[in-house]
Amino acid sequence: MATKDVKKICIVTAYPTQGAGSGTLITAQARTYVELGYDVTIITANNNTQFDRLPGVKYVLVPFTGEKEPIEHLEGALPFNFVMFTSHTNSSENFDNIKIEQLKAYCSKFKEIFEQEIKTNKPDIFHGQHCWISTALLTEYDIPVVTTIHGTDLMGYVNAKNKLAEINHEIAEGKLNPEVYERKAKYEFYMAAAEKAARNSKKIFVISHQQERKFKELFPFAADKVVLVRNGCDRNIFYRENPEDAKSVLDTLSSNITLDGKLPTDFDKLAIFVGKFAGFKRVDLVLKAAKIYEKEMKEKGKKVMTLIIGSGALEEELKNLQKSLALENTHFVGRQKADVVRKLQSISDVFLAPSDEEPDGLVYKECLLCGNVPVGTNSGGVPDTLNPEGKELTPISGTKVLPADYGVLIPMNDEEALADATMYVLENRDIYDRKKLMDYAAEHYDQMKISENIIIPLFNEAIANRQEER
């Protein structure tokens, strides 16, 4: 039988294509597939139709109902919001809170959309995002599925396993009410769905060595399917702008603490955070570190301005922390589009991202492509990006700061180390050559190269393997 190469690619995500790293990655990948001449569809969950769309890509909506006014009433929408592992700007619904009846409706709606797409377009391959429910459902059809692991799905599986152990303990102690058994059924379903997705996918894409180890630990039966496929960035969007030209972007942003709502311009150094306000992103550490480095740099005659770029469920809590810390030069400026983020990365002196166990982090790569210096935690997939050769790093005397080739690493949950690392970069900015940072990121994290040389051949291999099985 002659083998068939991929022509029609259907990317499936149970989340919106904006507001989280997985959506950014999907968008970058889809753009490259279109440029390479493929027919591309994105099936995406959302509670509205007002979102950015790529030319040449067909978008199929899995409709949900939003929480915030104005609510767009979508035809056939589920009567609840799209469901997240952590949080999203436009949804507070998560897999811990959802009820069994909602889960049944959730699965039915996804299957309805999948079957419509198969009937009308018959894709050659499904590219499922997250080893979770929607991907498990995809594997029920006679079309090969490859799955990208994003990290939150592995966290979700571990959470389900832990919650199930707690529930079984409650039952053993005699708590036999219906609510306990409903929760038990829910977490059993989550674990079974993740295992089904792992077992039935033709390929499993992981985005870091740490994630590869974790996936194989949780799903040893699917270890032979795992392929390391780095997250890439769209170099048409992320590149270094001339700082003098890019500075005007500050005039377009609003501060949450100044009387006139404008950002001050009399700063000497600029630090930024970019990301969603989820617990593991540790925006709280950025604020606590800012309290330290604002004061110490001020004593040295330097004013550091810090911009917090993003939004999410923890926004009110974080702004309350900002107020309690009496931060003078730290400003929340809201979620911003990619072109604004590019300009801010281009004019910034340091990028702060102290996440707990960040699976990979596109933002580090976007930062490097713009010639900025990232500070990240020595955990998860971050060392793969900032210290790719796995060198033995020596801390700066009297600190826990580990300068690496392409940024600075610190321990998790340590605001003093984050403050020390920030000041190290601000006071020694010339140690990191901007061109070296950009060249490294362009060589290793160009999404077009990754798509053309790695992903498309793996799609074709998955299709060929499926044909051999028939």
Walk through the language-model features, giving the residues of each.
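A conserved catalytic-core segment of Leloir-type glycosyltransferases
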Residues: 42-113
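Short alpha-helical donor nucleotide-sugar binding micro-motif in glycosyltransferases
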Residues: 335-336, 343-348, 455
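Aromatic "clamp/platform" in nucleotide-sugar-dependent glycosyltransferases that forms part
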Residues: 356
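Carbohydrate-associated surface elements
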Residues: 210, 232
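Membrane-proximal helix-turn-helix segments that form the acceptor-binding/catalytic region
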Residues: 169-204
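Nucleotide-activated donor-binding/catalytic signature segment of Leloir-type glycosyltransferases, i.e.
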Residues: 297, 303, 316-336
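Conserved donor-binding/catalytic core segment of Leloir-type glycosyltransferases
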Residues: 205, 254-281, 287-290
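Short hydrophobic beta-strand element within catalytic cores of glycosyltransferases
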Residues: 373-376, 383-387, 392-394, 399
